[in-house]
């Protein structure tokens, strides 16, 4: 197998390996999980438990519209039950906005908050019915506040205030507390993201990435816990923190409660006052931050605001929200390679203002950097190709005696100073980089809805006319003629079939990924032709001298 086929084979093999657990391991539907999971009580924190997936109480809906989102806030709990992203089209119908939060019979993904205190069980939770002055709100300036008022809680007055900002997916959630009671109040607030285990809208078999909760702290960094581990009561993550964020991640989009914004102070007053809690209860997965508020003396008031980010995983946005939030972009285990490649892709996009041409320039840059290794590989393959006739003669000479044939071949390699692995090793060094580039493109929401040329209006979707996959197949097939033929007839036949077999997978890949592979193959062929010509020229010069 020549080195180019080896690269493609390893790339696809690793891709299949990464997706194995997600595609072929048993999945738990919310109903199955509900049947087998015993709900934990959380009595230690006295935190209200999530409702059953089919029993989220519905009240009146408050409509909110900004330049970027359409939101629905339910008067029950003041929960954010629906959130549509107006600048991002739905996976199946791009004319409709993508819906991140949803509370319907088929899907549950909401943001909940509440207050609890042992001394005052009447504090508002996600089950309390709030009131609002208006049924709908429209952002007309730079900010918009939506105030919900809770019933009196033994003399304690509580308001829950949402703050929407222009040109922002960040939503402020503030509790205003006035203690009109006779006793001090020490409330704990919970900020929860609640969702079922279903794959997100538009999740494809060829573009499957992580879906589930994650936490980040300055001490323990980025940690993910799968839905399966939550259902089994497993998962290792930071339980206490003084900063960081807790999130629900999926392909291209995320939501997160931020305890310490990048440009602000932490809401945690000491190392024990903030806790993360990830669990599965009654068919729903919960990712929550618990925050102990400062004690509110009688006659005093307190206001605490925690930002909620709910939007795309765009690097230029999330990297400015909180420390470590750039890790939310799922580059897999090849983050160390994918992250700098994505950074370079963003810089190139800044030059050409087109993600398609940025991919072309990125491929050119990567090929230029690795040209010395590629040249060494092709020179080694050219030597192997020159020895092909002698290999055939050795095979005819030794017949079925494979032992003598192999000995003769190794002796020939030694005499001609040829390393049979010389064509593979330089390419093997590049494989992590190419896989990193694969993940950089796969995880980039920036490509979603991004046009290139002609009919390529969305580089995150497959080529609608399959032109790029066909070109991909053609380039792979043509490359077989530029490489030395394998001595084994069966292997030679496989080399003809493999391009067609692998190319079938590219029909389902996002167009941006296929564009990268097409450009990479064309450049590889051009490099190989150029290097072969150089070798032929040097060989002729050596003969003439």
From Swiss-Prot:
> What InterPro entries does the annotation carry?
Membr_insert_YidC, Membr_insert_YidC_N, YidC/ALB3/OXA1/COX18, YidC/Oxa/ALB_C, YidC_ALB_C, YidC_periplasmic_sf
| Residue ranges of the TM segments | 6-26, 331-351, 355-375, 425-445, 467-487, 499-519
Identify the domain of life.
Bacteria
A GO term for molecular function: membrane insertase activity
Subcellular location(s): the record lists: Cell inner membrane
Keywords of this entry = Cell inner membrane, Cell membrane, Chaperone, Membrane, Protein transport, Transmembrane, Transmembrane helix, Transport
**What membrane topology is given?**
Multi-pass membrane protein
Listed Pfam families: 60KD_IMP (PF02096), YidC_periplas (PF14849)
GO BP terms in the entry: protein insertion into membrane; protein transport
Q: Name one GO cellular component term.
A: plasma membrane
**Function description:** Required for the insertion and/or proper folding and/or complex formation of integral membrane proteins into the membrane. Involved in integration of membrane proteins that insert both dependently and independently of the Sec translocase complex, as well as at least some lipoproteins. Aids folding of multispanning membrane proteins.
Question: Which family does the record claim for this protein?
Answer: Belongs to the OXA1/ALB3/YidC family. Type 1 subfamily.
Assembly information from the UniProt record: Interacts with the Sec translocase complex via SecD. Specifically interacts with transmembrane segments of nascent integral membrane proteins during membrane integration.
Name of this chain's protein = Membrane protein insertase YidC
**High-level lineage:** Bacteria, Pseudomonadati, Pseudomonadota, Betaproteobacteria, Neisseriales
């Amino acid at each position: 197998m020549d080195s180019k086929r080896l690269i493609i084979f390893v790339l696809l093999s690793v891709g299949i390996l990464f997706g194995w657990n997600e595609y072929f391991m048993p999945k738990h539907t919310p109903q199955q999980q509900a049947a087998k999971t015993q709900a934990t009580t959380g009595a230690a924190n006295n935190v209200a438990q999530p409702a059953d997936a089919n029993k989220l109480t519905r009240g009146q809906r408050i409509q909110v519209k900004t330049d970027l989102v359409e939101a629905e806030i339910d008067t029950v709990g003041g929960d954010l039950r629906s959130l549509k992203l107006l600048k991002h089209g739905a996976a199946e119908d791009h004319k409709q906005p993508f819906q991140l939060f949803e509370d319907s019979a088929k899907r549950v993904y909401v943001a909940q908050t509440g207050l609890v205190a042992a001394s005052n069980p009447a504090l508002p939770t996600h089950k309390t019915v709030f009131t609002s002055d208006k049924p709908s709100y429209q952002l007309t300036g730079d900010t918009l506040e939506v105030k919900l008022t809770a019933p009196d809680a033994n003399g304690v007055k509580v308001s829950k205030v949402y703050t929407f900002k222009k040109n922002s997916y960040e939503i402020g959630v503030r509790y205003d507390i006035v203690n009109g009671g006779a006793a001090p109040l020490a409330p704990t607030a919970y900020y929860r993201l609640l969702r079922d285990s279903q794959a997100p809208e538009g999740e494809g078999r060829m573009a499957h990435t992580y879906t589930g909760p994650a936490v980040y702290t300055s001490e323990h960094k980025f940690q993910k816990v799968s839905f399966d581990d939550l259902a089994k009561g497993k998962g290792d993550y930071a339980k206490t923190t003084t900063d960081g964020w807790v999130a629900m991640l999926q392909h291209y989009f995320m939501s997160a409660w931020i305890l310490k914004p990048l440009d602000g102070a932490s809401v945690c007053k000491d190392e024990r006052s903030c806790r993360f809690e990830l669990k599965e209860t009654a068919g729903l997965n919960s990712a929550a931050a618990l925050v102990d508020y400062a004690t509110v003396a009688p006659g005093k008031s307190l206001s605490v605001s925690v930002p909620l980010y709910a939007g795309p995983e765009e690097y230029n946005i999330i990297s400015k929200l909180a420390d470590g939030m750039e890790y939310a972009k799922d580059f897999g285990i090849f983050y160390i390679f994918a992250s700098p490649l994505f950074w370079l892709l963003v810089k190139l996009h800044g030059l050409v203002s087109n993600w398609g041409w940025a991919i072309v320039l990125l491929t050119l840059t990567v090929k230029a950097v690795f040209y010395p290794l590629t040249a060494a590989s092709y020179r080694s393959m050219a030597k192997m190709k020159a020895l092909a006739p002698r290999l055939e003669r050795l095979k005819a000479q030794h017949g079925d005696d494979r032992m003598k044939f192999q000995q003769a071949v190794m002796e020939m390699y030694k005499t001609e100073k040829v390393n049979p692995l010389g064509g593979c090793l330089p390419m093997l060094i590049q494989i992590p980089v190419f896989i990193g580039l694969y993940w950089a493109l796969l995880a980039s929401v920036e490509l979603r809805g991004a046009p290139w040329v002609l009919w390529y209006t969305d580089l995150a979707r497959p080529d609608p006319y399959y032109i790029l996959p066909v070109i991909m197949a053609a380039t792979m097939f043509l490359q077989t003629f530029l490489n030395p033929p394998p001595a084994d007839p069966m292997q030679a036949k496989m080399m003809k079939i493999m391009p067609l077999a692998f190319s079938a997978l590219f029909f389902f890949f996002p167009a941006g990924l296929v564009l990268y592979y097409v450009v990479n193959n064309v450049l590889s062929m051009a490099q190989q032709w150029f290097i072969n010509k150089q070798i032929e020229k040097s060989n002729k010069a050596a003969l003439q001298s």
